[in-house]
Swiss-Prot record:
Protein name in the entry: Valine--tRNA ligase
GO biological process terms on file: valyl-tRNA aminoacylation
Subunit-structure text: Monomer.
Record bears the keyword Endoplasmic reticulum: no
Annotated organism of origin: Photobacterium profundum (strain SS9)
Length: 953
């Protein structure tokens, strides 16, 4: 082994060897249990971020552990075509490089351009996955628009249409006026804005008056421009001010339209004026009110969100309607929506109908990619009827076929699924799965897998002109088929039979509705087992939290707090990091602030920590479902942990290579207490590690490894071996070498799922020294399981006593400022014969590690001079102090410590007795101060006791 641990020199070469040797593939032995995980397919446009690194570490740890248990494991990898994101990347590229738009290319040529781009640049994220050590089967890599998944997507659409579970309708959607497409709620980003609430007078028709004699009512709105499409005003049916007006009419200013006043609980008596204008074609809440009261829907906006020359009027079913005429005032024709807002407010003012304007805090929805305010828009779209699909998906979770970890996410799932809305699946894009529907010249729609199939099924002659729908399917539609579409469905392939359902889905809670729920619905509808029962896509849903920065803020480019996992693996210089965070910003004005923050937080850039340290940090912070505040200090700490394991392994190899390790049959072995103890402690660690993985507690599994490797194996056991290796008999040395190398080999196997590279690298040096170890890689060795035969509770108790003895001596040295190297004569009053036997059996170890000249066991009533004392279990350990220390100097030092401690106690008591401080300070601050006070009070008691002991010398 190299002298120093250098992850850069081992990681990439090892991964290449693993991949080329085919170790990531399922072993194919169908007599063994199968275990599969389907990776959430990252966007093909993307690059690895901390969320990916976190989830991929969890999945790889689980897959590696199950592979080591002998299971036939598949970690299915692939990428998502990411419709809107990919189309925008390529549109920006051709605009920047060629000054062209997609329309200059035309649909087919532009799609070819995207495929070209994917071939050149779409592999970034898969290259980065390799850097994380992800043991996915690359030969099975899939893409959501490859031939197989495209065929599966088409098949699902056609079958759902034939079952009347897909329909086309005119409904309200989130419309991006810049990108000209419907977008999902997940692609809508709400922004807080300062705005206004305008109060308009709406005149009552037919001479009607309000209860207080006015001939108008006042409506409050944040969107004056939409009043051109108003078809009603809602008041609360319980509101005494307006309930008599229900059924009466308003004469809408500017357009002169007569619209009804309706009673609806959507109108809040205590909010605004209590009267709400209803624009069903331009507001989601109004759309629902309109449906309840059969109000027509009037669309006043173009797809650019400009005012139309003539409105479109529809009934509540989206059919064209002549309830109102379609005229709009000529001066507003073609006017941009926000310009129209100003003009309409001005006209209300001129008409004397502007009652007042108030400042108002708004939450405005923006398209996260187009960057403009989205518009609720009435458009023709394709929808999935989700209620029939949701019922069995709810039951599967209720019955425990699918379990959520943590369990509380079930409630979020149920809340959404029990009130599920139909799903808009069409998008006005070119890149994606084109909807398999064709129209004739009369607008009649035909659905089929191909145009030929449509013609044959419907007896359409070749002279009948058919035009395919221009829209593509929502990316989430094809993603919903991921667990079974990747395994060859609709064919009943061996892969589908072997690896479906998958074991666990590791996902963020933010896509529980967009992806998790839809996968469950689609899979249960289309995939059946041999008995014809619906199959679930996975048995467990493991919900992770988000990775946030050290202050708990979400990582985002605009905040300049994004950390690239690859930079933590390879390191990055400060100037390069500043350029990475500040270059190509959507809001360049933030660059100076971000540069300042970056220079302060990363003065020397980021040093290379290696993949294993990053993985271990992510695992150790993975408490289920909770957000993680990233901490570079913990990353540094776990890199030190990797160093510790490396150096400990070097110590083991230096003491075992070219030595007799007792592997020969019949070799004489005399195991020390420490040998037996570390063997027992390993069994405890193996038991805990496996239990934590089974419960998806990777944080606790990582902590088990840390505690065993650092504290027990390195800090204690290796130290305890030194006296034996220096002074023991041949049989004792042989047994200790045997224990060193076998426990290290087992430890490497136990740690491998989280720390793949360092464990493989060390294991290759350890393997030749351990009898019976076969195979070329640690990846296919057995994951250690608890073996009761190797655990001895009495041994553990004895060694814990030895540790307590040594620790007590070390603590007394520190308390009384006695040099660690100074030999001491100690005495002990033993509580029972057991402790006396422990001293006798372990005298060499105790004197060696505690640096003692002698240990004297005192007779029952034997008197002693003044001593420093400490309890070891129930026995009393004593160090005679005469001549060990300068009495006067030590008392003077202790007096100073006492005075300092008393000062701190007085200061904190003053704070806590100050009513002003207690009233204003947060509870957490007060608790901290109380804890500090308790700590200082305990210290004072110890100092006074030390003074008493020394004064008596």
């Amino acid at each position: 082994m190299e002298k120093t641990y250098n992850p850069q020199s081992i990681e990439q070469a090892l991964y290449q060897r693993w991949e080329e040797a085919g170790y990531f593939k399922p072993h194919g032995d169908t007599s063994k249990d199968a275990y599969s995980i389907m990776i959430p397919p990252p966007n093909v446009t993307g690059s690895l971020h901390m969320g990916h690194a976190f989830q991929d570490t969890i999945m790889d740890t689980l897959i590696r552990a199950e592979r080591m248990k002998g299971k036939n494991t598949l970690w299915q990898v692939g990428t998502d075509h990411a419709g809107i994101a990919t189309q925008m990347v390529v549109e920006r590229k051709i605009a920047a490089e060629e000054g062209k738009t997609k329309h200059d290319y035309g649909r087919d040529a532009f799609i070819d351009k995207i495929w070209e781009w994917k071939a050149e640049s779409g592999g970034t994220i898969t290259k980065q996955l390799r850097r994380l050590g992800a043991s996915v089967d690359w030969d099975r890599e899939r893409f959501t628009m490859d031939d197989g998944l495209s065929a599966a997507t088409q098949e699902v659409f056609v079958r759902l249409f034939e079952e009347d579970l897909i329909y086309r309708g005119k409904r309200l959607v989130n419309w991006d006026p810049k990108l000209h497409t419907a977008i999902s709620d997940l692609e809508v980003e709400s922004k807080d804005k300062k705005g206004f609430m305008w109060h308009f007078r709406y005149p009552l028709a037919d001479g009607v008056k309000t209860a207080d004699g006015k001939d108008y009512i006042v409506v409050a709105t944040t969107r004056p421009e939409t009043m051109l499409g108003d078809t009603g005003v809602a008041v609360n049916p319980e509101d005494p001010r307006y309930k008599d007006l229900i059924g009466k009419q308003i004469k809408l200013p500017i357009v002169g339209r007569l619209i009804p006043i309706v009673g609806d609980e959507h109108a809040d008596m205590d909010k605004g004026t209590g009267c709400v204008k209803i624009t069903p074609a331009h507001d989601f809440n109004d759309y629902e009110v309109g449906k309840r009261h059969s109000l027509p829907m009037i669309n006043i906006l173009t797809f650019n969100a400009d005012i139309r020359d003539a409105a479109e009027v529809f009934d509540t079913n989206g059919e064209a309607n002549d309830a109102y005429n379609s005229e709009l005032p000529a001066k507003y024709h073609g006017m941009e929506r926000f310009a129209a807002r100003k003009a309409i407010v001005a006209e209300f003012d001129e008409l004397g109908l502007l009652e007042e304007v108030k400042d108002h805090d708004l939450t405005v929805p923006y398209g996260d990619r187009g960057g403009v305010a989205i518009e609720p828009m009435l458009t023709d779209q394709w929808y999935v009827r989700t209620a029939p699909l949701a019922a069995p998906a709810v039951k599967a979770v209720e019955d425990g076929q699918i379990q959520f970890v943590p369990k509380q996410y079930e409630n979020m799932y149920f809340a959404w699924m029990r009130d599920v809305q139909d799903w808009c699946i069409s998008r006005q894009l070119w890149w994606g799965h084109r909807i398999p529907a064709w129209y004739d010249n009369y607008g009649k729609v035909y659905v089929g897998r191909t145009e030929d199939e449509v013609r044959e099924k419907n007896n359409l002659a070749s002279v009948v002109v058919l035009r395919q729908d221009d829209d593509v399917l929502d990316t989430w539609f094809s993603s919903a088929l991921w667990t079974f579409g990747t395994q060859g469905w609709p064919e009943n392939t061996d892969a589908l039979k072997t690896f479906h359902p998958s074991e666990v889905l590791v996902s963020g809670f933010d896509i529980i509705f967009f992806w998790v729920a839809r996968m469950i619905m689609m899979t249960m509808h289309f995939v059946k087992d041999e008995e014809g029962n619906a199959q679930v896509p996975f048995k467990t849903v493991y919900m992770t939290g988000l990775i946030r920065d050290e202050n708990g803020d979400k990582m985002s480019k605009s905040k300049g707090n994004v950390l690239d996992p690859i930079d933590m693996i390879d390191g990055i210089g400060l100037e390069e990091l500043v350029e990475k965070r500040c270059g190509n910003m959507m809001q360049p004005k933030l660059a100076a602030k971000i540069e300042k923050q970056t220079r302060k937080a990363f003065e020397g850039g980021i040093e290379p920590y290696g993949t294993d340290a990053l993985r271990f940090t992510l695992a150790a912070m993975a408490s289920t479902g909770r957000d993680i505040n990233w901490d570079m200090k913990r990353l540094e700490g776990y890199r030190n942990f990797c160093n510790k394991l490396w150096n400990a392994s070097r110590y083991v190899l230096m003491n075992t290579e070219e030595h007799d390790c007792g592997m020969a049959e019949g070799a004489e072995l005399e195991f020390s207490l420490a040998d037996q103890w570390i063997t027992s402690q390993f069994e405890v660690a193996a038991k805990e590690f496996n239990a934590h993985l089974d419960n998806y507690r990777l944080d606790m599994a990582a902590n088990t490894l840390y505690e065993f490797i650092w504290n027990q194996f390195c800090d204690w056991y290796l130290e305890l071996t030194k006296p034996v290796l220096w002074k023991g008999t041949e049989a004792q040395q042989r047994a200790t070498r045997y224990t060193l190398i076998t426990v290290l080999e087992k430890t490497l196997r136990l740690a491998h799922p989280i720390l793949p590279y360092i464990t493989e690298s060390i294991w290759q040096s350890v393997k030749p020294l351990v009898d019976g170890v076969e195979g070329e890689t640690i990846m296919t060795q057995a994951l250690p399981q608890f073996n009761e035969d190797n655990f001895n509770a009495d041994v553990v108790a004895d060694l814990e006593w030895v540790k307590a003895f040594i620790t007590s001596i070390r603590n007394l040295r520190a308390e009384y400022d006695i040099a660690p190297s100074k030999g001491l004569d100690v005495m002990i009053k033993v509580a029972d014969e057991k402790d006396a036997a422990r001293i006798q059996a372990n005298e060499i170890v105790l004197t060696s590690l505690a640096k003692l000249d002698s240990i004297k066991v005192l007779a029952k009533n034997e008197e002693t001079q003044a001593c420093a004392t400490s309890l070891v279990g129930k026995s009393e350990l004593m160090i005679p102090m005469a001549g060990l220390i300068d009495k006067d100097a030590e008392l003077a030092r202790l007096d100073k410590e006492v005075a300092k401690t008393q000062g701190e106690i007085k200061r904190i008591e003053g704070k806590l007795n100050n009513q002003g401080f207690v009233a204003k300070a947060p509870e957490v601050v007060i608790t901290k101060e109380r804890e500090k006070l308790e700590g200082y009070q305990e210290t004072l008691v110890k100092l006074e006791a030390q003074k008493e002991t020394i004064a008596a010398l």
